[in-house]
Amino acid sequence: MTNLRKTHPLMKIINDAFIDLPTPSNISAWWNFGSLLGVCLVIQILTGLFLAMHYTSDTLTAFSSVAHICRDVNYGWLIRNLHANGASIFFICLFLHVGRGIYYGSYLFKETWNIGVILLLTVMATAFVGYVLPWGQMSFWGATVITNLLSAIPYIGTTLVEWIWGGFSVDKATLTRFFAFHFILPFIVTAMVIVHLLFLHETGSNNPSGLNPDADKIPFHPYYTIKDALGLLLMILLLLLLAMFSPDMLGDPDNFSPANPLNTPPHIKPEWYFLFAYAILRSIPNKLGGVLALLMSILILLVIPFLHTSKQRSLMFRPISQTLFWLLTADLFTLTWIGGQPVEQPFIIIGQVASILYFLIIIALMPLAGLLENYMLKPKW
């Protein structure tokens, strides 16, 4: 009799995705982040669900309800800290996952890559509306500043902003709808993750060499289930260390004060994982230009597959492109640092140079390096 795992309609899907999946034998730990992101999503949905049971989305009680969760609900402090820091771990894994995709040429699976970029945007939107919910000072002013960017859209901008706000300022209507969005978006993300996996399993995984791995594949279970379990253990350890010992390390001190529309914080800035995009936004002294640059900083990922000029898929054997990749990584760290600094010299000029370099590396330097490496591969005799 055939194994039920291979015949049952539902079990068969799980089996083909996580058990008998033919996987390249040489994929490194950089391929762990997909499963880690899946676990992050589950953690965020579960902790979020328990927080939603006690949270009230009203301007008068939102801040107090979060304090109530931390003080009076059994393990409420832990659930909240896991949720807040889980978001940071989520974004660390996301950035590493995207970085891996760029380094090893995984973007050449265009459908998988495109749905991945849309996923990244959706997760960023989810995190943004979620940050508004505790209704602290930075929550309120962050929401005000970022939603206000839409007013840069010609003709319809102001109307659009007031439509999103549900009034003439960020108020009760805004908070209520942001809570509704924050609740529904993770489930939309989950559906998109399934589509992401569906497209990935059409082609199979890429591998560090960038060569066709069909000749040498091994079953996902037990080889990669155990390998993913190690990564999972390390991620959970990092999350628990953060949540237990320094839960407020990545947050903003201004968010300990309830939202006050009459008092603007000295430095309005988003959570650390948006700072690179925020720095790009601020580096352009024109509102509409800044908004377009902000959008392009993420949407540029969609054009990367069309800018691939090399005969090799991966950067594994391409030292010039490797150098540019790590320069881009350093540039993103610089932008993240600048995004958290006040708007004054020398930070303004550093931010502008870093922003130009970001787009220059992706649009011009990497494709040129690919062509140069192709030329260097040609026999010269």
UniProtKB/Swiss-Prot annotation:
Question: What GO MF annotations does this protein's record show?
Answer: metal ion binding; ubiquinol-cytochrome-c reductase activity
Query: What Gene Ontology terms describe where this protein resides (cellular component)?
Result: mitochondrial inner membrane; respiratory chain complex III
Where along the chain is heme b b566 bound? 97, 196
SUPFAM superfamilies linked to this entry = a domain/subunit of cytochrome bc1 complex (Ubiquinol-cytochrome c reductase), Transmembrane di-heme cytochromes
Membrane topology, record value: Multi-pass membrane protein
Instruction: Note how many cofactor molecules are bound and how.
Output: Binds 2 heme b groups non-covalently.
Q: List the disulfide bonds.
A: none
Q: Which InterPro entries match?
A: Cyt_b/b6_C, Cyt_b/b6_C_sf, Cyt_b/b6_N, Cytb/b6-like_sf, Cytochrome_b, Cytochrome_b_C_euk/bac, Cytochrome_b_N_euk/bac, Di-haem_cyt_TM
Residues that hold a ubiquinone according to the record: 201
Sites where the protein binds heme b b562: 83, 182
TM ranges are 33-53, 77-98, 113-133, 178-198, 226-246, 288-308, 320-340, 347-367
Q: Does the keyword Zinc apply?
A: no
State where the protein is found.
Answer: Mitochondrion inner membrane
Q: Which residues form the signal peptide?
A: none
What single Pfam family name could you report for this chain, choosing any that match?
Cytochrom_B_C
Q: Origin, by domain of life?
A: Eukaryota
Function according to Swiss-Prot or TrEMBL: Component of the ubiquinol-cytochrome c reductase complex (complex III or cytochrome b-c1 complex) that is part of the mitochondrial respiratory chain. The b-c1 complex mediates electron transfer from ubiquinol to cytochrome c. Contributes to the generation of a proton gradient across the mitochondrial membrane that is then used for ATP synthesis.
- What PANTHER family would the database entry show? CYTOCHROME B
Quaternary structure per UniProt?
Answer: The cytochrome bc1 complex contains 11 subunits: 3 respiratory subunits (MT-CYB, CYC1 and UQCRFS1), 2 core proteins (UQCRC1 and UQCRC2) and 6 low-molecular weight proteins (UQCRH/QCR6, UQCRB/QCR7, UQCRQ/QCR8, UQCR10/QCR9, UQCR11/QCR10 and a cleavage product of UQCRFS1). This cytochrome bc1 complex then forms a dimer.
Other notes: Heme 1 (or BL or b562) is low-potential and absorbs at about 562 nm, and heme 2 (or BH or b566) is high-potential and absorbs at about 566 nm.
Q: What is this protein called?
A: Cytochrome b
The organism of origin for this protein: Perameles gunnii (Eastern barred bandicoot)
Q: Which gene encodes it?
A: MT-CYB
